């Protein structure tokens, strides 16, 4: 479903598309693939693109993803480096949407008439990140509507402090 949607949108917008499957990048599919496996697969695909001459990959991580990542890492005992969250850039990668929440990106897409698809696994509470998304984020928003933006700013400050202490 997701691949078909992306193929159709890329064709409509005349955007080149390269589709990878696990075997294309030498990633074995485990009996029970989970979030960590999916992330490794995505980055193996990104690495294959870069090896094929693509200079950089822009991901669609948002301030909402940043908040989820921070909460997830803190719950697992992260220190300052982990509290820096998703970095805006690193060699070969940029994340231009970190300044917008998921709701804001959806508003922009709606205003521009751009459709999107939501990964159906996002609805399942089988994944820790989804449990944070479904329970913690609404609770935080009830305390402060700007919670996601505030968490994103905290991650920026943590990244600066982490870089300072790494010198």
Would you name each region that the model predicts?
Residues 1-138:
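Core alpha/beta nucleotide-donor-binding catalytic domains of modification enzymes
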Residues 127-167:
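ATP/NTP-dependent adenylation/nucleotidyl-transfer catalytic domains that generate, transfer
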């Amino acid at each position: 479903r997701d691949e078909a949607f992306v193929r159709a949108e890329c064709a409509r917008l005349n955007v080149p598309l390269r589709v990878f499957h696990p075997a294309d990048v030498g990633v074995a599919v485990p009996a029970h693939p989970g979030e960590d496996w999916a992330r490794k697969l995505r980055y193996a695909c990104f690495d294959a693109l870069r090896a094929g001459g693509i200079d950089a990959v822009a991901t669609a991580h948002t301030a909402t993803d940043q908040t989820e990542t921070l909460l997830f890492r803190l719950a697992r005992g992260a220190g300052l480096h982990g509290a820096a969250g998703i970095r805006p850039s690193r060699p070969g990668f940029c994340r231009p949407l970190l300044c917008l929440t998921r709701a804001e990106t959806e508003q922009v897409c709606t205003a521009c008439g751009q459709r999107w698809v939501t990964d159906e696994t996002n609805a399942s509470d089988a994944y820790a990140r989804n449990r944070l998304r479904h329970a913690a984020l609404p609770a935080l928003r009830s305390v402060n509507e700007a919670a996601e933006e505030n968490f994103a700013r905290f991650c920026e400050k943590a990244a600066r402090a982490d870089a300072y202490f790494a010198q």
